[in-house]
Amino acid sequence: MPEEVQTRCVIVGGGPAGMMAGYLLARAGVPVAVLEKHADFNRDFRGDTIHPSTLELMHELGLLDEFLKQPHQEVRELRAVVNGEAVPIADFSKLPTRCKFIAFMPQWDFLNFLSSHAKRFPSFQLHMKTEVVDLLIENDRVVGVRAKTPRGEMDVHADLVIGADGRHSVTHTRAGFKQCEFGVPIDALWMRISKKKDDPEQSFGFFQHGKLLVMLDRGDYWQCGFVIPKGGFEEIKARGLPQFQNEIVSFAGFLHDRVSELDDWSKIKLLTVQINRLRDWCRDGLLCIGDSAHAMSPAGGVGINLAIQDAVATANLLAEKLRNGPVSVDDLRQVQLRREWPTRLIQGMQVFVHQRVVTGRASGNKGSLPFIVRLLKWFPILRQLPARFIGLGPRPEHFRSPTA
């Protein structure tokens, strides 16, 4: 027989959406259990950008000063090398926030920080190595989840299940939710290349006629993302590592003396880029948020921050009611109603960028700079527009959930 556990809310997935929702609900006095299938949060090539909107939330929680003591890099302006010319893209200095920068921080540090603070609330539980495999359903209502643990099976019964288990979500699959898929013509290859002290400062990446190499400063190494045509990885491997290394050097020449570190394809990880969203985020007893509700492209690094905004809206709308008992389907729909149009807007922009600008294929247009990039170069005030879209996003959330 499975072990039986009872709580008010169970959250499937200990990523940014799940951990923030768990923290906020526990802060409001709601008994909550977060179930994470892995033994720790250490994953390579996850979203590591903490945008000004998220930093503002940390300030509102009174956690910002301690949070910024964690190892991180601060980027106050996004710059890119476009067709060989360095150009500014976004200027965060005029944002109406306490922190006018993007913080680059390993996601595991962010999640460890949040979980350590959440554990201070008596109503919070975190179960690691607990993999949810199914929903518990009674009379067409989701009443909990079944999970595998090192001790055996465990049934967690709850008034609300929050699915925050990512784009390969068990919760939305078992619930029978239908997705709207948006074709994206690219995938991305992620890799590490060592960093030297005399390397040029690089905040964004290199763009050449439809192709893109993103470089993120990780202190002693570069985390590099190379955009390729959708499904094109096998063709790239067939051409061989030397040709792939040469292509990387053609974007960032200063890597010529160490690109040989990529001496095996196992050091190069494929990220299949998806943009999709659920038609319905909820049913009786279940709400999906974050990547479980809407998978984002890496473009702009907005996925983690959109997921956190979902979590804040969830706590704002549901915490008070959850403290007193179950919530209705109409209550759950309020979260989708609030968060769906920001999701649609950002996904629409990402689809446009991938279909018209970053395609992973060499473009026939060999002009020096795209017109919109020339405008950003000529008129500095225009750089505030991408800064607001990336740094704050549409409809940024603020805390309104109660405190226990």
Go through each PLM region and give its residues.
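Beta1/beta-strand and adjacent pyrophosphate-binding region of the FAD-binding site
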Residues: 2-17
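Glycine-rich FAD pyrophosphate-binding loop
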Residues: 26-46
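Active-site-adjacent segment of FAD-dependent monooxygenases/related oxidoreductases
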Residues: 51-117
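A conserved beta-strand/loop element that lines the FAD pocket in flavoprotein oxidoreductases
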Residues: 119-133
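Conserved FAD-binding catalytic core of PHBH/FMO-like flavoproteins
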Residues: 130, 141-155, 160-273, 277-282
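Glycine-rich phosphate/pyrophosphate-binding beta-alpha loops
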Residues: 212, 275-277, 293-305, 341
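Short FAD-binding loop at a beta-strand-to-alpha-helix junction that anchors the flavin cofactor
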Residues: 282-298
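C-terminal helical "tail/cap" subdomain of flavin- and related membrane-associated enzymes
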Residues: 316-404
